[in-house]
Amino acid sequence: MSSEFNMLIFKKNIVNWNQFNGIQMIKKLFSLFVFVFLLTNFSAFGQDISLYTQINGRYDFTFVGNTMNTAENNPTPFYVTNTSSSATLNLTPSDNVIRAYLYWAGSGDGDFEVDLNGTIITPDRTFSHSRFFDPNTFTYFSAFKDITTLVQTTGNGTYTLSNLDISAFEPLHFSRKTNFAGWAILIVYENPSLPLNQLNIYDGLQGVPDALQIDLTNLYVLNNANAKAGFIAWEGDSQLPTETFTVNGTVISNPFNPPNNVFNSTNSVTGSNQLYNMDLDIYGIDNYISIGDTSASIALTSYQDFIMINTVITKLNSQLPDATIVLNNPTTTCNSREINLDFTVSNVNSTEILQANTPITFYAGTEVIATTYTQNIIPIGGSENGNITLTIPSSVPLNFTLLAVVDDTGNGTGIMTELVENNNTFQIDIELIVSPEF
């Protein structure tokens, strides 16, 4: 962040020069500075934040993690990054860990073998980001590991991540004040006292100051109480208050994050303001989501401070079904255009019952063959088995693909809003057998 750091120095020098050289000289120097700054050869590449997974149930989330930086890299005039740090997880006895995702990150090309409480960890996925300031390329990395079993086994207590070493890259990044490293565990837990919630987890490694906007769709907000959003972000500086977090167009804040200083080295879970060059922030968004909303938009912006967003998670009390279908055991007989098959309609990843009489339409290619309906209410996590005999028209070839679509009235439209609208289909290849002619 030497560009930001140098901007601060420059402004300070302008104040001093004003005492001796006058306002006209200031204007000329500032114009020259802006001109040179705009001509700087700069480009950036990263991996945009996108939906990783959606989890539905009586769930909530929290973070545990820590920075490797012993001080903020800007304006500290020395290297600040260690290779180990610890944090404490403290869930209640009624909280049951459902998911635990470890993210670690730092400056440079990447350290993809670290230790967590003495267990060697290698990533399931990796992310990268780079910025080019002529003549150097500044790289950054993040890694992801599903450590659900480890956290379920360990439970509450101290978690220590070690052997995260970015020392080979620290001299280069020190020149721009972007030398950092840190880690965080995103924990999704179940508690029977919670309402049915929808958790959306997004990740990548996307640089801000470009505005990062996430549009949440397929919602049906039944209750806006305790709605919240959180994120894991890297490389923020508390001394550069130029960032905002908005929900549905409204700038929001919390006791740890002023409206104009979102990325300020804070941890909303512990209340610490010494999470240097890293943010684990959680915001209540109750007042910005309305009952009955079917969509929402959140956005993060930074106008000067260089930030990387690694993870965004939202929790909303959105209650909708999620119909899926699977076909099994298709049987045919020789010289017949009838097919008998079993099917199962499920409502597993949902927060509401699936009503009876949900339509199921069968297609041969693009031609509608038949429509049937579920018989009973399917509870959350439940399923219903069915059987049907289809008569295939003579216009359909002997070899074709049979497609089943649940929540389809026969013209490609459904009768309900679902949590996920693109998982309603299942297809299998069918061969009709005809006796050879002699």
Predicted regions: what they are:
Residues 1, 6, 35, 165-169, ...:
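Short regulatory "switch" loops immediately downstream of catalytic or recognition motifs
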Residues 1-47:
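Bacterial Sec-dependent N-terminal signal peptides
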Residues 7, 14-22, 42, 261-268, ...:
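Short linear motifs in intrinsically disordered/low-complexity regions
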Residues 21, 45, 156, 248, ...:
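Feature targets compositionally biased, intrinsically disordered low-complexity regions
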Residues 45-333, 340, 344, 359, ...:
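Disulfide-rich extracellular domains of secreted proteins
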Residues 318-438:
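Extracellular/luminal regions of secreted and cell-surface proteins that mediate adhesion/ECM remodeling
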